């Protein structure tokens, strides 16, 4: 009985670790990265990537929930998304 109580306390006292999505880059993690942020972020939407109205319904849930980051330079706002596959 004492063993169950100790095991339960250990399990609930550990910090909650969430599985990070491959697309998930927190801004703090990007800021602390040793390489330039351009290695992690690319402009969104990508240049040359054309949207097809017929294919919009077939997008995967992962791409729909993709995180976007905004950088404001003067009056212009730039959106970035994590780089994948490089």
From Swiss-Prot:
Name of the coding gene: capa-1
Q: What name appears for this protein in its UniProt entry?
A: Neuropeptide precursor capa-1
Please cite one Gene Ontology biological process associated with this protein.
Answer: neuropeptide signaling pathway
GO molecular function term, any single one: G protein-coupled receptor binding
> What does this gene product do?
Encodes at least three neuropeptides: two of the periviscerokinin family (APHPSSALLVPYPRV-amide and LYMARV-amide) and one pyrokinin (AFFYTPRI-amide).
Keyword Ion transport in the entry? The reply is no
* Keywords recorded for this protein, A-Z: Neuropeptide, Signal
Record keywords: Signal included? yes
Signal peptide stretch:
1-19
Superkingdom to which the source organism belongs? Eukaryota
Q: Which organism does this record belong to? A: Caenorhabditis elegans
How would you summarize where this protein is expressed among tissues? Expressed in two pairs of neurons in the anterior part of the nervous system (at protein level).
């Amino acid at each position: 009985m004492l063993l169950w109580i100790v095991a339960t306390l250990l399990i609930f006292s550990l910090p909650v670790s969430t599985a990070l999505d491959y697309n998930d880059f927190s801004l703090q993690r990007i800021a602390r990265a040793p390489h330039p942020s351009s290695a992690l972020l690319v402009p969104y939407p990508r240049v040359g990537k054309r949207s097809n109205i017929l294919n919009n319904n077939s997008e995967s849930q992962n791409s729909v929930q993709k995180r976007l980051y905004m950088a404001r330079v003067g009056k212009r706002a730039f959106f970035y998304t994590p780089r994948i596959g490089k």
